[in-house]
C-alpha cells in the first residue's frame, strides 16, 4: 500500500493531507474522500473493499471536490465501533484525527490489505476496490481468489 506523500503513518501530519488535497488527482484506487454525512454502511463498504484488495485510506470530513468540510457526526469512538460491529473478520486499521486552523476535524482511516479475506459486511456482502470505486464482488472466481489468499496465510 502507498503512503500519503511518502510519509510513514506515524509521521503523517495535517500538512501532508493538505498537500494530497492540492494535487490534481481525484479519488483514486487508494484514496476515498467522504463528507460528514456519509452513512456507516458506506464507510463499511469502503473498508471491506480496501481490506479485500490492496489497502487504502478514507479521508473523512473531506468532500468529493477535496474541500475540507469537517466532521461533527463522526469521532474516533464512532469510527472504531462501526468497524468493530460491522465487519468480519476485523481488518487491520488505524485512525488519525487532525484539526485545521478553522477548527474543522478530519479523520484519516488507514486500512491495510487484509491477511485473512474475505472481509464481509454485516449485510453479508463482500466488496472490492476497482479504480476509484468500491463494488460488491459477484464473480465466483474473484471470491475463490480471496479465499485462496486466506489459505496461503495458514
Regions found by a protein language model. Give the residues of each.
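Conserved N-terminal catalytic/coupling substructures associated with nucleotide/phosphate chemistry
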Residues: 1-154
Amino acid at each position: 500500500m502507498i503512503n500519503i506523500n511518502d510519509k510513514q503513518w506515524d509521521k503523517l501530519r495535517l500538512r501532508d493531507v493538505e498537500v494530497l488535497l492540492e494535487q490534481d488527482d481525484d479519488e483514486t484506487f487508494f484514496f476515498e474522500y467522504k463528507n460528514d454525512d456519509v452513512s456507516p454502511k458506506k464507510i463499511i463498504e469502503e473498508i471491506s473493499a480496501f481490506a479485500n484488495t490492496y489497502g487504502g485510506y478514507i479521508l473523512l470530513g473531506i468532500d468529493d471536490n477535496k474541500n475540507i468540510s469537517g466532521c461533527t457526526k463522526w469521532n474516533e469512538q464512532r469510527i472504531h465501533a462501526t468497524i468493530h460491529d460491522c465487519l468480519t473478520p476485523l481488518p487491520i486499521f488505524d485512525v488519525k484525527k487532525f484539526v485545521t486552523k478553522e477548527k474543522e476535524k478530519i479523520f484519516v482511516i488507514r486500512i491495510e490489505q487484509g491477511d485473512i479475506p474475505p472481509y464481509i459486511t454485516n449485510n453479508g456482502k463482500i466488496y472490492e476496490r476497482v479504480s476509484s470505486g468500491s463494488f460488491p464482488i459477484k464473480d465466483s472466481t474473484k471470491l475463490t481468489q480471496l479465499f485462496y489468499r486466506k489459505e496461503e496465510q495458514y
